[in-house]
């Protein structure tokens, strides 16, 4: 990251007597794959020319298919995988590669809906990523104020001066009086144990009530976008700069997921969207670890081999 390719390209000019050795023979890929690779990389003008070759057979010709949208692309891939499995092959023979992990959501959605087991190498599934779980937790608490588990997750994310000790006291009071934690927070002035945290708790309730009001009359996408903004989550990630870029793109993808779900259903609500997410998150928990479609970035795939490989998101930019 941050490397300058000119250091390699200009090396012979900088150091007299440089001898370039080209490692062109490939022992792993079939001829048709190498021909495609040579053709593609040939468009790159800033490189030392070389031509990959092999003694292996030409093999199967790789195919390139253009799609109108990423959803069309992934739905087509999933149908192709289903045919591949129906022909007697294993899920573990299939790899789906992408340049950036943020591209994984759409293909995960399509795989999960068809109950195709998959695993992600070198990363987390979309709905297992911390920032995604945070936004989903906000939506869950809006849908159900008595969801104490999700409330614990987001009450101090971003930081609101509501520490772990205060949260534990709220949980203890809720258990003692057999009410939800939200009920305790709304009546913080009645409980001396959390009196010092009342200003911070009041601020949280004000923010929460604002988001609940937005849930009435807003689309799922608008509500999710509002949660990201008014919770302070967007600002928290933006303040992280480059380090928060991928996380911000992931939470924005939750907005896309909400919009896509709403477009696919004539009548829907927040609870139904959250139920869908729950199903997508748990689809392959009972399947064996070995026999799953493998998903990973191109970088993580180096040195690995699969019988059937899809590379998604190949776009001109």
Give a label for each model feature.
Residues 1-10, 25-29, 227:
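Conserved helicase NTPase motor core
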Residues 1, 8-9, 34-35, 39, ...:
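Metal-dependent catalytic core segments for phosphate chemistry
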Residues 7-10, 73-80, 134, 253:
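Well-ordered alpha-helical segments embedded in enzymatic catalytic cores
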Residues 90, 104-116, 129, 136-317:
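Conserved helicase C-terminal RecA-like lobe
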Residues 16-19, 24-117, 140-145, 212:
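Helicase P-loop NTPase motor core
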Residues 117-127:
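A short glycine-rich beta-strand->turn/loop micro-motif centered on a GG-aromatic cluster
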Residues 3, 25, 69, 99, ...:
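Structured loop/turn residues at secondary-structure junctions
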């Amino acid at each position: 990251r941050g490397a300058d390719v000119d250091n390699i390209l200009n090396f012979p000019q900088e150091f007299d007597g440089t001898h370039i050795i080209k490692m062109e023979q490939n022992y792993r890929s079939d001829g048709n794959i190498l021909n495609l690779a040579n053709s593609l990389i040939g468009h790159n003008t800033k490189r030392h020319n070389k031509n990959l070759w092999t003694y292996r057979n030409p093999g199967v010709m790789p195919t390139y298919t253009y799609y109108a949208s990423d959803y069309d692309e992934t739905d087509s891939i999933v149908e192709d995988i289903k045919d591949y499995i129906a022909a007697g092959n294993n899920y573990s023979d299939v790899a789906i590669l992408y340049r950036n992990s943020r591209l994984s959501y759409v293909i995960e959605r399509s795989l999960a809906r068809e109950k195709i087991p998959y695993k992600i190498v070198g990363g987390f599934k979309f709905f297992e990523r911390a920032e995604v779980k945070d936004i989903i937790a906000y939506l869950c608490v809006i849908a159900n104020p008595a969801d104490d588990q999700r409330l614990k997750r987001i009450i101090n994310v971003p930081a609101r001066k509501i520490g772990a000790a205060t949260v534990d006291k709220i949980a203890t009071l809720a258990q003692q009086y057999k009410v939800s934690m939200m009920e305790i927070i709304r009546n913080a002035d009645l409980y001396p144990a959390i009196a010092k945290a009342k200003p911070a708790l009041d601020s949280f309730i004000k923010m929460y009530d604002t988001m609940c009001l937005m849930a009435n009359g807003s689309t799922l996408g608008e509500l999710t976008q509002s949660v990201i903004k008014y919770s302070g989550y967007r600002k928290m990630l933006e303040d992280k700069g480059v380090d928060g870029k991928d996380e911000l793109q992931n939470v924005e993808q939750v907005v896309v997921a909400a919009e896509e779900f709403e477009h696919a259903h004539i009548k829907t609500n927040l609870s139904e969207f959250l139920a869908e997410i729950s199903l997508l998150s748990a689809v392959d928990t009972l399947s064996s670890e070995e026999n799953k479609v493998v998903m990973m970035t191109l970088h993580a795939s180096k040195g690995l081999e699969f019988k059937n490989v899809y590379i998604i998101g190949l776009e001109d930019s």
